[in-house]
Design a protein with these regions (language model features):
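Short flexible coil/turn linkers enriched for glycine and charged/polar residues
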Residues: 15-17, 29-31, 75-77, 89, ...
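Short glycine/threonine-rich loop/turn motifs
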Residues: 82-192
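Short, charged beta->alpha transition segments
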Residues: 20-24, 65-71, 98-99
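Short N-terminal or domain-adjacent regulatory/targeting segments
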Residues: 43-75
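Short nucleic-acid-contacting surface segments enriched for D/E, G, S/T with interspersed K/R
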Residues: 2-21
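Acidic/polar active-site rim loop that often engages polyanionic ligands
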Residues: 32-42, 75-79, 186-192
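OB-fold/S1-family single-stranded nucleic acid-binding modules
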Residues: 20-55
Length: 192
């Protein structure tokens, strides 16, 4: 069932996710009850993830902060870029390469504010990086958050209320490059 679930949902079968399973229950006088999982419904888990994203976006909208970052004026040519990413991320390397070899010959200053881009500490790590940038806000034109593609569960750290609220209200435009083009996180929805 695990491979079926992971292939169907694009996320790892780990603790903390909600699942809907079909089971049989048996009773043995000596050993007691036993439960056998017969099937799993991956659409239930996908629905729960989508519901959580909708609830966060609705809460941000009710608080009046959902579109605040989008309303900030974007510099015509943002040249001082604070990057939140992992130093070893391929996406970060690709981003820097594209800036360095741009067809216009423009110079861009980038500074990396390292953060974890996967796992249970994504929210805390990215928020800490944003705090560091905020302490030096006058040195930058924009913030870019970069995390390459992966399984849907790998991107769940970007679907949190605290991180979305912080980015929505950040005083600089926040640009996201999270996951593949088809991926959509709460953070993408609030970013510039």
């Amino acid at each position: 069932l695990k491979p079926y679930f992971e292939e169907s949902t694009g996320q790892l079968f780990t603790s903390g996710i909600k699942v809907l399973v079909k089971v049989t229950v048996q009773f043995h006088e000596l050993y007691g009850y036993s439960l056998t999982v017969l099937d799993i419904d991956p659409t239930y888990t996908l629905g729960d993830m989508a519901r959580r994203r909708r609830e966060i976006l609705l809460q941000l909208e009710e608080e009046g902060v959902l579109t605040l970052n989008k309303e900030l004026e974007m510099p015509v040519l943002p040249q001082r870029i604070a990057v939140v990413s992992s130093a070893t991320a391929a996406g970060y390397g690709d981003f820097c390469h594209q800036l360095k070899h741009n067809s216009g010959g423009f110079f861009f200053y980038t500074e990396l504010f390292p953060a974890l881009m996967q796992g249970n500490q994504v929210e805390e790590s990215v928020l800490a990086a944003l705090d560091c940038i905020n302490a030096r806000i006058s040195e930058f034109d924009v913030v870019v958050i970069i995390r390459g593609g992966g399984a849907a569960s790998d991107l769940s750290g970007f679907d949190t209320y605290l991180l979305a609220a912080a980015c929505a209200q950040f005083p600089l435009p926040v640009i996201t490059g999270i996951g593949h083009e088809r991926d959509d996180t709460v953070l993408d929805s609030v970013a510039h």
